[in-house]
Amino acid sequence: MSLKQIVGHKLLNDVIRPLKKGDGRSAWNVLIVDTLAMRMLSSCCKMHNIMEEGITIVEDLNKRREPLPTLEAIYLIAPTAESIDKLIQDYCARNLYKCAHVFFTEACSDQLFSTLSKSAAARFIKTLKEINIAFTPYESQVFNLDSPDTFFLYYNAQKQGGLTSNLERIAEQIATVCATLGEYPSLRYRADFERNVELGHLVEQKLDAYKADDPSMGEGADKARSQLIIIDRGYDAITPLLHELTLQAMCYDLLGIENDVYKYETGGSDENLEKEVLLDENDDLWVEMRHKHIAVVSQEVTKNLKKFSESKGNKGTMDSKSIKDLSMLIKRMPQHKKELNKFSTHISLAEECMKQYQQGVDKLCKVEQDLSTGIDAEGERVRDAMKLMVPLLIDPAVRCEDRLRLILLYILSKNGITDENLNKLLQHANISMADKETITNAAYLGLNIVTDTGRKKTWTPTKKERPHEQVYQSSRWVPVIKDIIEDAIDERLDTKHFPFLAGRQVNQGYRAPASARYGQWHKERGQQSNYRSGPRLIIYIIGGVTFSEMRACYEVTAARKPWEVVIGSDRIITPDKFLTNLRDLNKPRDI
């Protein structure tokens, strides 16, 4: 089962289904969720599945709700002071619901547990459990902690006021990812950024607590080989800056997709309708195409459309015009409207991406690839990077953000430049001194940016030759994470730069003491049957994971069975989001 399937299975089987009461009006329950639980639910379960299990309405804990005193309420919430206060208020003056079944997404602190136990709401609570899913399964191998403040707290030394509580929180969330997957992994971290070891120890403590509550966690074939690697964003600042030409990364970079919703116009010549489509794994064509290079996506979608059309008895030839506008085909085959609309979406995605590519992204890609790899398309070493860059820096048609991306790539390729040279570059590129901070703030990530004196050498794994992988001239850069993952699987990852936490290199027959406080709240016996055998590599990047890095994990998983690579972060980032994070890094921020 994939990460998404495991979470969906747990939500239905451990939270919703046990409280279903049969048929009739009294059988219905209300489901109350906080923001994270709503995202988790939306990611894994369809509304009709939830309703089939007796849920009549899903409500937001933080919004005003109408009383439904004849119905029982299921609360799926994080055990925070705010959430518990809202829960208590529901049973104060008048009861909003008949009784409460409370499921915390993670471990509840003693203090909050005591507050709830002593409240007036306590006598209405019929169920109180921890399900240990404090993350959103974004894709089958990707998780999101949805913690946008982490980047600012972790990388800016002046904002450490909220850092301790944030690290505690994300450590708990990371531990719930491992617990959900049934893993008790060895723990490694990137040593070149000092704070990583602190987070590593916090995660270790949380994992040990989960292991104490469920000794079967991490048992099974090859599970002793599973690893969790904690990495800071400074390990590879090049990947978040590049224009990537595989479909998913390109769409999110260029097409302004928000909350995974793609908007486009469709229809015949007389009418234009705006459509909204959710890009997720429920669309099998999206899953098939998302990691493919844009050069082949259009051809493959067209080929698949033609094959589908002919398999349904439509033998007419399809010229380019009818592919561009599928409305006539939909009229001829109305019973297949749903499938044809999928093709329409993907043709539109590919066309929009290609249009942007041809309108200037192609020139950016060439220079970006030369800067990032240090080698040009002919395999020659790049000798004058400035000469490549300047025509784009002075071109008014190139967006300010794209010029910033180029300058940062140039600086990283040089391992830092002088302040004088940076100011000259900014002047060339017509970039304001206010935007200069976007560049200089990258130093907070441990990168050499402005270096008037000595430069520290940054270690990266040796780049591999990849003779069997198809390489496009405009996509020669391979995300550093791919080399790290492959080296970790092959037991070749440098232990000086990626050390194991003491005592966590090999898990052999570990048996933690039973939890005195929680007993066996955390897991029901027999749950392990849902977990896959074989080792997992779990990657956590502090400060955002890119779509290119997500793709690398799927590629390695496909090539290195029985290993499965799962990757996650506090948020999913695009190049523009990465620049915004850098720009705001030293600004006052309410946490």
Swiss-Prot record:
Changing residue 322 to E: Reduces binding to unc-64. Rescues the uncoordinated locomotion defect and sensitivity to acetylcholine esterase inhibitor Aldicarb defects of the unc-18 e81 mutant. Motor neurons and a limited number of neurons constituting nerve ganglia. Expressed in hermaphrodite specific neurons and AVE, SIBD and SIBV interneurons. Expressed in body wall muscles. Expressed in cholinergic motor neurons. Expressed in the AFD thermosensory neuron. Keywords: Cell membrane, Cell projection, Cytoplasm, Membrane, Phosphoprotein, Protein transport, Transport. Changing residue 322 to A: Rescues the uncoordinated locomotion defect and sensitivity to acetylcholine esterase inhibitor Aldicarb defects of the unc-18 e81 mutant. Impairs temperature sensitivity, tolerating higher temperatures compared to wild-type. InterPro entries: Sec-1-like_dom1, Sec-1-like_dom3a, Sec1-like, Sec1-like_dom2, Sec1-like_sf. It is a peripheral membrane protein. Changing residue 39 to C: Does not interact with unc-64. Increases sensitivity to ethanol. Mildly resistant to acetylcholine esterase inhibitor Aldicarb. Rescues the uncoordinated locomotion defect of the unc-18 e81 mutant. SUPFAM superfamilies: Sec1/munc18-like (SM) proteins. Phosphorylation on Ser-322 by pkc-2 reduces closed conformation interaction with unc-64. Not phosphorylated on Ser-322 by pkc-1. Belongs to the STXBP/unc-18/SEC1 family. This is Acetylcholine regulator unc-18.
